[in-house]
Amino acid sequence: MTNSPLAGASVRPLASACPEQAAASIIAAAHDLLGHFAAGRRIDAPALRTAMQSAIGASDASGAWDWKAAYEAVEVAQLLFMRRYGPAIHAKTIDPFERLQLVERIARLAPTQTRRSEEMQAYQQFSTPLGLAWVAGFAAGFH
C-alpha cells in the first residue's frame, strides 16, 4: 500500500519539472530543514526524506525526486541558516577561528552526501562544504 498522493498517477521527476517548480520544491524542503539547524538537530536520511516528501508530495521511490535534489535542499537550508544567524555568529566573537568553529558545528548537522546519482558521478559534482565557503567569504571580505 502506498501513501503517496500521486498513487496511480504518473509522477513527473523533479529534474524534468519546470525550473521554477523544482526550485520552489527545493526551497520549501529547505525551510522545513532550517528548523533542524536552528534547533541543533542532526538531519538524518529519514528527516531529509520527510522534508522532501512534504515539499513534493511524493517519495523518492516514486521517482518524483532524487537525492541530488535533497542534498541541494540541505545546502539551501544552510544558506538560510547563515542568512538568519550569521550576524549573531559574527557578533558573538571577533576571532575568525571561533566563528569558523560555530559554522562547522552547524555543518556537522548536515548529512553526508553518500547517495550519489550516476550524473553526479559522471560529472564529478561535489558540493563546497559550509566551512570552506565561510572561509572563502571571510577571505573575500564578506561580512
Regions found by a protein language model. Name each.
Residues 19, 23-143:
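Class I S-adenosyl-L-methionine
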Residues 1-21:
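Glycine- and charge-rich intrinsically disordered segments
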